[in-house]
Amino acid sequence: MAEFATIARPYAKALFGLAQEKNQIESWLGGLEKLAAVVQEGKVASLIDRPETNASEKADILIDLVGLKDKELKNFVIVLAGQKRLSILPEVYAQYQDLTLSFNHIKSAVIYSAYPLTDKQVGELVQMLNKRFDSELKISVEIEPELIGGIKVEVGDQVLDLSVQGKLSALYTTMTN
């Protein structure tokens, strides 16, 4: 959700800045991942949405469920609970993860394919994409049958569409204009 992204951004940046100071970037990433997963569970999500449960109870429950030990992460959860922002934790995690990758000079990339790719094909694609984007890429592969054939690659806000669906869409646009 775009709204959650806008709201989560300053929280993720502030937490990342503190993590840099404390040299805790990777360990906090793990804690945020657990928090994001727990918040998305049905019972926990409904608890977060209940107005009769106060903020400190919600924070304590989350902290206990995840087993947080780090004082700063606990305080972060308490602040989010106080601001009624616990539901943005998955987006905070996603943005914190992007900041971590960027800090480590790694970009996140998604390869969409109409059909499953072999390990060899993925390896060759990774080599080509690393050269094209001049950085190390963290790759995930997703199957999208609606592409018909070929692949589509997203790296940050850049899209490389080499799919049959993309070619047909471009042809349609050219013919109708």
From Swiss-Prot:
Question: What PROSITE patterns does the record tag this protein with?
Answer: ATPASE_DELTA
Q: GO terms for biological process?
A: proton motive force-driven ATP synthesis
Cellular localization per UniProt: Cell inner membrane
Answer yes or no on keyword Cell inner membrane.
yes
Q: Which InterPro entries match?
A: ATP_synth_OSCP/delta_N_sf, ATPase_OSCP/d_CS, ATPase_OSCP/dsu
Subunit arrangement? F-type ATPases have 2 components, F(1) - the catalytic core - and F(0) - the membrane proton channel. F(1) has five subunits: alpha(3), beta(3), gamma(1), delta(1), epsilon(1). F(0) has three main subunits: a(1), b(2) and c(10-14). The alpha and beta chains form an alternating ring which encloses part of the gamma chain. F(1) is attached to F(0) by a central stalk formed by the gamma and epsilon chains, while a peripheral stalk is formed by the delta and b chains.
User: What family does this chain come from, according to its entry?
Assistant: Belongs to the ATPase delta chain family.
Q: Which GO terms describe its molecular function?
A: proton-transporting ATP synthase activity, rotational mechanism
Q: From which residue to which does the signal peptide run? A: none
Q: Which UniProt keywords apply?
A: ATP synthesis, Cell inner membrane, Cell membrane, CF(1), Hydrogen ion transport, Ion transport, Membrane, Transport
One matching Pfam family is OSCP
Q: What does this protein do?
A: F(1)F(0) ATP synthase produces ATP from ADP in the presence of a proton or sodium gradient. F-type ATPases consist of two structural domains, F(1) containing the extramembraneous catalytic core and F(0) containing the membrane proton channel, linked together by a central stalk and a peripheral stalk. During catalysis, ATP synthesis in the catalytic domain of F(1) is coupled via a rotary mechanism of the central stalk subunits to proton translocation.
GO cellular component terms listed in the entry, alphabetical order: plasma membrane; proton-transporting ATP synthase complex
Record-linked Gene3D superfamilies: N-terminal domain of the delta subunit of the F1F0-ATP synthase (1.10.520.20)
- Its membrane topology: Peripheral membrane protein
Q: What is this protein called?
A: ATP synthase subunit delta
Source organism (scientific name):
Neisseria meningitidis serogroup B (strain ATCC BAA-335 / MC58)
> Species lineage, top-down?
Bacteria, Pseudomonadati, Pseudomonadota, Betaproteobacteria, Neisseriales
